[in-house]
């Protein structure tokens, strides 16, 4: 399977907007509402979800993860020179990006659903300890823009867009986070090197204009190799698909936010 790191890095630059907290001078400041899914901007998280903290005074520097930060296939818990760490339920969250107003991290995959405490520490100065409830899944599609889901044509990985729409009967790749447990399980800190399908695949659905696509149209749903927290769905567009349908993902009782469309030209 082709590496998806360049695409995932592009996904990571698609930033959600969150409520601005009221901050005290100097200390890291954020709120429960400003800890959100990095894909959708919704305050819904699950284990193995790519997440963002928005606030003030989160870091003195701006840094994104680089290959040199990854040692022996393990993600960093702090980016060199930043002095920033995030703890989630007593474990360090692995970092992808830090800046004064935003920090991107991975919710540890070994956590269980339920309430956890999230706290950001900047060079020994701690921000508030915020209580957040983790769901078993918090589906969220990465976005090309505020109303368009991010998708790639198969097999060349070019972007699906209004200028290059998907077609019925053709395969596309969708990119998401928060889809829940996989088999074999995601391991704490380790970058996945092989495919790992959703554990509850029978409870996973892709909805186009509210209608579940046939099971045989989902060729794969699970981790995207080479990038922790990123999920890949291989979807064959149904022959009946209309133009630019709304697309949502459902994992168990949890659905991705409404309002995103997938560019399709019947």
Language model segments and positions:
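Initiator methionine at the very start of the polypeptide chain
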Residues: 1, 18-19
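Sec-dependent signal peptide recognition
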Residues: 2-7
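Hydrophobic h-region of N-terminal signal peptides that target proteins for export
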Residues: 9-18
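A sequence-level detector for low-complexity, Ser/Thr- and acidic-rich stretches
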Residues: 19-266
């Amino acid at each position: 399977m082709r590496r998806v790191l360049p695409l995932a890095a592009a996904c990571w630059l698609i930033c959600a907007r969150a409520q601005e907290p009221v901050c005290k001078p100097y200390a890291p400041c954020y709120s429960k509402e400003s800890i959100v899914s990095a894909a959708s901007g919704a305050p819904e998280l699950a284990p193995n979800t790519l997440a963002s903290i928005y606030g003030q005074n989160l870091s003195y520097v701006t840094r994104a993860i680089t290959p040199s930060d990854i040692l022996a296939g393990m993600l960093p818990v702090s980016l060199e020179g930043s002095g920033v760490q995030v703890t989630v339920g007593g474990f360090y969250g692995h970092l992808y990006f830090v800046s004064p107003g935003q920090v991107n991290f991975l919710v540890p995959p070994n956590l269980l659903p339920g309430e956890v405490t999230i706290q950001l520490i900047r060079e020994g100065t701690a921000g508030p300890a915020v209580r957040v409830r983790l769901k078993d899944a918090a589906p969220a599609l990465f976005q090309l823009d505020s109303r368009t889901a991010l998708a790639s044509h198969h097999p060349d990985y070019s972007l699906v867009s209004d200028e290059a729409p998907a077609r019925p009967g053709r395969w596309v790749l969708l990119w998401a986070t928060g889809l829940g447990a996989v088999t074999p399980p995601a391991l704490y800190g380790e970058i996945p090197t092989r495919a790992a399908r959703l554990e509850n695949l029978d409870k996973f659905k892709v909805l186009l204009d509210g209608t579940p696509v046939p099971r045989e149209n989902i060729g794969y749903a699970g981790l995207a190799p080479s990038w922790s927290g990123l999920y890949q769905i291989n979807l064959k567009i149904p022959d009946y698909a209309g133009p630019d349908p709304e697309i949502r993902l459902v994992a168990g009782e949890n659905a991705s936010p409404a309002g995103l469309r997938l560019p399709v030209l019947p």
